[in-house]
A protein has these predicted regions:
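Catalytic cores and adjacent flexible loops of soluble metabolic enzymes
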Residues: 1-224
Length: 224
């Protein structure tokens, strides 16, 4: 049984602790720290986490909103402090500015070395195929941006990825990951083609490309 304390920030950490102990006493297994307005700063959130951990054995979860673009960061903070449940959604779909992005958080956890039983590229495809078409405005979670951040791939090389992935009919996301694993400082078309050929042999099949807007990436942005 979980209790969701909406607008947790509206009460002090001490009051939150008292309420948590009360609901735990009457049967709740877990309490949620809830950033309903998406305005909790990490150090503020951590006050609620620490007072609960130091004064009880009650499990906790976190539900964040992204009004100040901190929902994923705050989710990571709670995970590092032992949270049992983190609320997330594909494309960060949710009220107001939305919730923590499932896609982004998965790749953040992978960057931190977590071994996850999930195919992140399939997750991105599901999000693009089923969630984005339902949204009234374009999704905030762009696959190429996530992959670039995860792989530490500089976006000025996107024209190379665009050209080579089209030439070899490869998913640009997979090509970015493979190229960046080999080279981060100076990505050439020759290198990308060499890696693309190896990917093609490994896959033994054509990969359907999504319609990515490569034109929004500035070619010479490293010159600035």
């Amino acid at each position: 049984v979980a209790v969701n304390f909406m607008k947790s920030y509206a009460s002090s950490p001490v009051t939150f602790l008292k309420a948590s102990k009360f609901v735990n006493k009457i049967g709740a297994d877990l309490v949620y720290i809830v950033d309903s307005a998406g305005g909790m700063l990490p150090h503020e959130l951590n006050q609620y986490v620490q007072i609960l951990k130091k004064n009880s054995n009650i499990h906790f979860g976190f539900h964040g909103h992204d009004n100040l673009t901190l929902s994923n960061f705050n989710s990571l903070l709670c995970i590092s402090e032992g949270a049992k449940i983190i609320d997330i959604s594909l494309q960060g779909l949710g009220r107001s500015a939305g919730n923590a992005s499932f896609e982004t958080l998965i790749f953040l956890l992978m960057r931190y070395g977590f071994k996850l039983k999930i195919d992140p590229l399939k997750l991105l495809k599901i999000s693009e195929k089923y969630i984005i078409p339902l949204m009234s405005s374009p999704g905030k979670t762009k696959s190429l941006d996530i992959i670039s951040g995860y792989s530490q791939f500089h976006s000025s090389y996107m024209p190379v990825i665009d050209e080579v992935s089209n030439k070899f009919n490869l998913d640009p996301k997979e090509l970015i990951i493979a190229v960046s694993a080999k080279e981060k400082s100076h990505v050439t078309k020759e290198l990308a083609q060499k890696i693309a050929k190896k990917l093609k042999k490994l896959k033994k099949r054509n990969l359907t490309q999504n319609n990515y807007n490569f034109k929004r990436y500035v070619v010479n942005e490293q010159d600035n």
